[in-house]
Amino acid sequence: MQKTTRTMPAHKHVALVAHDNCKPELLRWVKENKEKLQRHFLYATGTTGHMLSKETGLAIKSMISGPMGGDQQLGALISEGKIDVLVFFWDPLNAVPHDPDVKALLRIASVWNIPVATNRATAKFLFDSPLLEQEVDIEVPDYEAYLAERM
């Protein structure tokens, strides 16, 4: 597939997601990184977003709950270039009914080449990077070329 470049803005669009068993850990991480996070545009699946907003006072655009389609809503935003970073504290030891949606969200994040943090360690590395506060060029699929090949 041909590639093109997309410029991520200095103020990133960050999606925050957590499975139920991981919500307390994400909340703790968000509280620890509130100062950094408030400089960016925040999105989340429904339950996670409402909990984080209530507990931290951060402005978060909440989708619907993950199992009800929120993961897919975030995936659509990623494919439209409207999400720059995904922080997804998922529980690898417990299956959830919407596992196919979870896999699809992680797959689409990889397709569109956005950074993904799946635990505290990767989130720390990502949010301690100076690139978080800078414009960054990333390679993404050239959808126009992809479409032209198929027409």
Curated annotation (Swiss-Prot):
EC code(s) of this entry: 4.2.3.3
UniProt-recorded name of the protein: Methylglyoxal synthase
Name of the coding gene: mgsA
PANTHER family noted in UniProt: METHYLGLYOXAL SYNTHASE (PTHR30492:SF0)
GO molecular function, one term: methylglyoxal synthase activity
Species annotation: Vibrio parahaemolyticus serotype O3:K6 (strain RIMD 2210633)
Keyword Lyase: yes
Annotated MGS-like domain residues: 6-151
GO biological process: methylglyoxal biosynthetic process
Stored NCBIfam families: MGSA, PRK05234.1
Enzyme class: lyase
